[in-house]
Amino acid sequence: MSMFDKPFDYENGSKFEMGIWIGRQMAYGAFLGSIPFLLGLGLVLGSYGLGLMLPERAHQAPSPYTTEVVVQHATEVV
């Protein structure tokens, strides 16, 4: 039986039950909100860990955007 299946009466016991129900709903909402956050955090940490497992040669590769490449493209156009 749900909290709202009967008319709400304002006795002390009912107020306590309503507070418990509200707290459970808030905790459930926080749980649902934490799922995308934890998935995103896992994705970021997983990609970082994958980058750490790459060979050392991959860490020391030159940048693909060096000035030499830019100068070569500029001279080819002219």
From Swiss-Prot:
GO terms for cellular component: plasma membrane. It is found in: Cell membrane. Its main location: membrane. Keywords: Cell membrane, Membrane, Photosynthesis. InterPro entries: Intrinsic_membrane_PufX. One of its GO terms (biological process) is photosynthesis. It comes from the Bacteria. Associated with the reaction center - light-harvesting complex I. May play a critical role in facilitating the interaction between this complex and other components required for light-driven cyclic electron transfer. Belongs to the PufX family. This is Intrinsic membrane protein PufX. It comes from Rhodobacter capsulatus (Rhodopseudomonas capsulata).
